[in-house]
Amino acid sequence: MTIIVTGAAGFIGSNLVKGLNARGENHIVAVDNLHRADKFHNLVDCEIRDYLDKDDFLSRFERGEFGRVRAVFHLGACTDTMEQDGRYLMENNYRYSKTLMELCLAQDTQFIYASSAAVYGESHSFREAREYERPLSVYGYSKFLFDQAVRNRLDGALSQVVGLRYFNVYGPGEAHKARMASIVCQQFEQFRAEGTVKLFGEHGGHGPGCQSHDFVSIDDVVKVNLFFLDHPRRSGIFNVGSGHARSFNDVACVVVNTLRAAEDKPPLALEELVQEGLLEYLRFPDALRGRYQSFTQSDSSRLREAGYTAPFVAMEEGVARYCQWLLERGQ
């Protein structure tokens, strides 16, 4: 049967298509918007049956043009957390998603979509419950509102509906995201270009570079998606993160020392990186004040209760592997 992936040329989407291909799934319809044409590079190594623009997809899916569809992985959305056009975000991230969910329910098709840890805002608890959801941006609100729509449909849903709340995902295939690429990718590119990594200084009770996020490897994200594909009776909203918050300082140490190792240079401790000017701290930008999550850490209890038992890749291992991958490709 056909599997449809929206946002297929994007970061998570293209990696998911590769993960499906690795299992022998090639009857895949890729849906995206190639307004950013350079995203096509992510699809070059993918085996797909067809490609559609997102604006053409919904009507054709509603008409049943793809026959029996096993699952729709909905990863297409505006992922720019700094986007200020609320109408655009609500149309793309909320209304489009809501229409697609209803079509999947009507056709008895598994629906697995991308939510975001942005729904939690500055909450100090990251559990999938309404009382902990306090988005700081209109992007986070668009994701939050669709999650509420999903909750309102779950009780009567006869087919699978799964929302996956991604924390800070990193890995191959994200370079096109520019300022929305992971901290790992940004630090790698900055150090290669300038010989230093620049982090946020003190802000909101967090010391220089001590802002901490839950960094999760794209490999783990793909595995979680495939788990729910294989377990169509599981529905709900689930966090997808390592369960461990790591500081930007921690990540920078791994990035810089991986690059130093490639030049046969010894690793340096955080204090040494700062002393040698390889790590600098900048004033926290005014544009992010009141809109930035200084701390995130996934509560994976619900995911584990659903039966997902695989361990998550440790930050040190995953970041070093990703940096080596970038080096091998001359990036």
UniProtKB/Swiss-Prot annotation:
It comes from the Bacteria. NCBIfam families: heptose_epim. CDD domains: ADP_GME_SDR_e. It is an enzyme of class 5 (isomerase). Catalyzes the interconversion between ADP-D-glycero-beta-D-manno-heptose and ADP-L-glycero-beta-D-manno-heptose via an epimerization at carbon 6 of the heptose. Its cofactor is NADP(+). The active site is at Y139, K177. Contains a large N-terminal NADP-binding domain, and a smaller C-terminal substrate-binding domain. This is ADP-L-glycero-D-manno-heptose-6-epimerase. HAMAP family: Heptose_epimerase. Belongs to the NAD(P)-dependent epimerase/dehydratase family. HldD subfamily. It holds the Pfam family Epimerase. Gene3D superfamilies: NAD(P)-binding Rossmann-like Domain, UDP-galactose 4-epimerase, domain 1. Pathway: Nucleotide-sugar biosynthesis; ADP-L-glycero-beta-D-manno-heptose biosynthesis; ADP-L-glycero-beta-D-manno-heptose from D-glycero-beta-D-manno-heptose 7-phosphate: step 4/4. One of its GO terms (biological process) is carbohydrate metabolic process. Its EC number is 5.1.3.20. Keywords: Carbohydrate metabolism, Isomerase, NADP. Binds 1 NADP(+) per subunit. It comes from Cupriavidus pinatubonensis (strain JMP 134 / LMG 1197) (Cupriavidus necator (strain JMP 134)). Substrate binds at N168, R179, Q186, F200, G201, E202, H203, H213, Y292. NADP(+) binds at residues 11-12, 32-33, 39, 54, 75-79, 92, 143, 169, 177. GO terms for molecular function: ADP-glyceromanno-heptose 6-epimerase activity; NADP binding. The keyword Membrane does not apply.
